[in-house]
UniProtKB/Swiss-Prot annotation:
Protein name: Cytochrome b
PROSITE patterns, per database record: CYTB_CTER, CYTB_NTER
GO cellular-component term (any): mitochondrial inner membrane
Predominant location category: mitochondrion
Binding residues for a ubiquinone: H202
Native species: Aspergillus terreus (strain NIH 2624 / FGSC A1156)
Cofactor binding summary note: Binds 2 heme b groups non-covalently.
Residues reported to bind heme b b562: H82, H183
Recorded name of the encoding gene: cob
Length: 385
């Protein structure tokens, strides 16, 4: 045991995973960190394995994926693990962010942790988009065309940027090559950001807790208590992931991507993966191209303003009934945006999308500050009595 505390590298591991003092009352909602680390590990291992058999060429990309599925030993398993763990990764990240919003994890002194977390989300979305293009099915090609074309909304230099990204005048061999290179690189950038995220949390005050108060009143070491607690959710995660991988591997994908990319034929609807749908819905809700692109990026960056706009004296919404209602309305609205992103651009959905988009931004910039001020006033009134 002594080497764990004296060895220059092992003592860092010891301070994070063995002796790290955690508040004794943290619930299972604090288990997402370990699950997300596991997801990233699975993605890197399966991704590197897939890269060994993949060919980033317009002519061979689709066939190389079929070769992985049919000819490589357990290639189908590696590919389905990679695609379904990507969905699990985003599902858990959204729950992790939801936990952070509910329990006020963005408030000082954890603002840096929250900011790095938001950057992690953006890098994840970029990585997922790049990866979706690689199988080079119909959705891959047209998704790449639509999303890269968003850059053309930038005044004056937009079209030049698009052609610079493509490496030509349309999505071609150069595009696929650079997307593959970047898709391979970004998970390692993500791993570095995750370490920064952990350092930012560990070197301030550590984890929060469901009461939103200081955790110093009662703490327990990470091992063995929280290691076993994390293992419970890790086993549940593997069971659920296995159900998807072995019984319904394509449930979360799009059948259009099993059609080889054809630049001469547009698919009936160009839809991204489910985890990017809310932001795609916000993009489509605004008729102006440039404003739509700005709104889509602002929707992600809006998370960054939470430490500023939440003016409440209490951490989290667990003891604030009005904020609790606002939080659940926000969650419902996010799920509605997810549905609308998958629909055709036609009459009821356009209006619903616009209302939901307004409500989404109103939550961050209007509802949260107003409701927190009302609750502060109510708290002051009751304490004066």
């Amino acid at each position: 045991m002594r080497i764990l505390k004296s060895h220059p590298l092992l003592k860092i591991l010891n301070s994070y995973l063995i002796d790290s003092p955690q508040p004794s009352n943290i619930s299972y909602l604090w288990n997402f960190g370990s699950l997300l680390g596991l997801c990233l590990g699975i993605q890197i291992v399966t991704g590197v394995t897939l890269a060994m058999h993949y060919t980033p060429s317009v002519l061979e990309a689709f066939n190389s994926v079929e070769h992985i599925m049919r000819d490589v030993n357990n290639g189908w398993l590696v590919r389905y693990l990679h695609s379904n763990t990507a969905s699990a990764f985003f599902f858990l990240v959204y729950l992790h962010i939801g936990r952070g919003l509910y329990y006020g994890s963005y408030k000082s002194p954890r603002t840096l942790t929250w900011a790095i977390g938001t950057v992690i989300l953006i890098v994840m979305m970029a990585t997922a988009f790049l990866g979706y293009v690689l199988p080079y099915g119909q959705m891959s090609l047209w998704g790449a065309t639509v999303i890269t074309n968003l850059m053309s909304a930038i005044p004056w230099i937009g079209q030049d940027i698009v052609e610079f990204i493509w490496g030509g005048f349309s999505v071609n061999n150069a595009t696929l090559n650079r997307f593959f290179a970047l898709h391979f690189l970004l998970p390692f950038v993500l791993a570095a950001l995750v370490i920064m995220h952990l350092i930012a949390m560990h070197d301030t005050v550590g984890s929060g807790n469901p009461l939103g108060i200081s955790g110093n009143y009662d703490r327990l070491p990470f091992a063995p208590y929280f290691v076993f607690k994390d293992l419970v959710t890790i086993f549940i995660f593997f069971i659920v992931l296995s159900i998807f991988v072995f019984f319904m591997p394509n449930a979360l994908g799009d059948s259009e991507n099993y059609v080889m990319a054809n630049p001469m034929q547009t698919p009936p609807a160009i839809v991204p993966e489910w985890y990017l749908l809310p932001f795609y819905a916000i993009l489509r809700s605004i008729p102006n191209k440039l404003l739509g692109v700005i709104a889509m990026f602002a929707a992600i960056l809006a998370l960054m303003v939470m430490p500023i706009t939440d003016l409440s004296k209490l951490r989290g919404v667990q003891f604030r009934p009005l904020s609790k209602v606002a939080f659940y309305v926000f969650v419902a609205n996010f799920l509605i945006l997810m549905q609308i992103g998958a629909k055709h651009v036609e009459t009821p959905f356009i209006e619903f999308g616009q209302i939901s988009t307004v409500l989404y931004f109103a939550h961050f910039f209007v509802i949260v500050p107003v409701v927190s001020l009302i609750e502060n006033s109510l708290v002051e009134l009751t304490t004066k009595k």
